[in-house]
């Protein structure tokens, strides 16, 4: 396979590749472009910009926006939903780090 085709195929598998326009992203989420702008303004996701300045979203960003949409649909204000998701992500990171430290301590604890 030629190099340029390999690169294009790699982009299809990349969760961070900005493949979705604002309109398409809104359709996928069942949301409005205004909702996407709101989660962007709240700092939850930062879409990339095309050369023409249009917002482009990745699959990872759409998953995050979908979680915000779930919270908003349950009655949570957009800003609060974004904060909740940020805190959930921070908690996941802290728990993961805690597990790694405990694993290292368990491995080295037997040596001391």
What are these regions (language model features)?
Residues 22-23, 37:
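Residues within the helices of the helix-turn-helix
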Residues 2-18, 27, 41, 46-47, ...:
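Arg/Lys-rich, alpha-helical DNA-contact motif
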């Amino acid at each position: 396979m030629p190099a340029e085709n390999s690169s294009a195929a790699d982009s299809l598998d990349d969760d961070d590749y900005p493949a979705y326009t604002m309109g398409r992203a809104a359709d996928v989420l069942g949301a409005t472009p205004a909702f996407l702008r709101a989660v962007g303004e709240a700092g939850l996701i930062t879409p990339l910009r095309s050369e023409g300045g249009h917002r482009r979203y990745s699959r990872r960003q759409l998953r995050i926006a979908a979680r915000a949409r779930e919270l908003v649909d349950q009655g949570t204000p957009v800003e609060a939903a974004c904060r909740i998701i940020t805190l959930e992500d921070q908690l996941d990171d802290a728990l993961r780090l805690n597990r790694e430290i405990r694993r290292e301590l368990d491995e080295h604890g037997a040596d001391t």
